[in-house]
Amino acid sequence: MASAEIIAVGTELLLGQIVNSNAAFISQELAADGIYVYHHTVVGDNPTRLKEVIEIAENRSDILIFTGGLGPTEDDITKQILAAHLQKQLVEDEYHMNKINEYFTSRNRTMTENNKLQAVIIEDSIVLNNDFGFAAGMYLRENNHTYVLLPGPPSEMKPMFTSYANPLLLSESGDQNILESKIMRFFGIGESQLAADLNDLIVTQVNPTIATYAGDNEVVVRITATAKTKEEASRLVKETEEEILRREGTFLYGYGEVSLSELVTAMLLEKELTISAAESFTAGLFQAEIARFPGISKIFKGGMVTYSEETKQSILQVSPQVIKEKGVVSAECAKEMAENVSRLCKTDIGISFTGVAGPDSLEGHPAGTIWIGLSVKGYETEAFQFVYGRDRNHNRRRAVKQGFQLIKQFLDAN
């Protein structure tokens, strides 16, 4: 099976000024092709170091995919260094040169000489058209290696890879095994606990393989299988998925790239259930999250951020007696907040967040203590307590996700 290495060229990547999202995209695409990516390399705009990286990559990878360094400036050196390494000439590509000329002519501007560099390619390479920019891409087979050169901007790189580079890679792959992956998403269990529960599967299984990753207050499990056919690979993945569900299905909330909040929002839209929120602990984060999704105005009627005792009483109409006797960090306060916001906004569901974000304690409660209230029309209002750590912003994000999980659990059960 062919192995690939992705080489990102650009000092700005090493300085942390730009995130290397290109590598993640290409890796996902190659995985679907059954081509394994074993190495990601980032190198600055330095000729000596780039040449060293090329030599190292050739010794361990069949396919070398470069991103960046194809532009018009002096530090765009990728094709120059690779051409010299392969002892090949640089030649002009007519299509891209005409495209650049037409651009400047149509705007009555004079093209500087350095812009012509974007239309220069390595001889004997297949030109990859840049439909959204000027820098030509290249695909080259030489000395039992495949070299793919792509521009750095993702808006240019992604369509070039998808439309031109990937079909060429697939045409060369021949009898490559099919690689099938499935992403499972869990909430309410830590990565270490989940990994321990699945340890026998993780250690003993070779095909499929199982990997766990800690996400943003969640755990992601990836199952990956290889086989000669897609049907066989899917069967292998399915068998492992069913065993994981048997053990940890309680904590599963979804699959693939769909977030918990997106999933719950879709469920609310499908059921045509309206919702409102009263927030203290989370200070509007829940409302900001649910408002991200298209069509949300059909079900999200509004909410309130009542951070102080005074606003809880004056705006949200929480009973002064409840606050005096039970405190704002209490089940009683959370319930009243949820019920009142639902009543005031005239919604089917009201959710509330009140607690101690941290790092200091409040009313004798340690940092990270939170009560989430859930009021649903026709059902008894409930309040749920959780105790997190001392990291204030981490606690707030986790509470928002916890709120969506509570809504999902209710919708699943009713």
From Swiss-Prot:
Taxonomy, superkingdom: Bacteria
Alphabetized SMART domains for the sequence: MoCF_biosynth
InterPro entries: CinA, CinA-like_C, CinA_C, CinA_KH, Competence-induced_CinA, MoaB/Mog-like_dom_sf, MoaB/Mog_dom
Gene3D superfamilies per the UniProt record, alphabetical: CinA-like, MoaB/Mog-like domain
Gene this chain is encoded by: cinA
Species whose genome carries this gene: Listeria monocytogenes serotype 4b (strain CLIP80459)
Family: Belongs to the CinA family.
Protein name: Putative competence-damage inducible protein
TM region(s), chain numbering: none
NCBIfam families membership: cinA_nterm, molyb_syn, PncC_domain, PRK00549.1
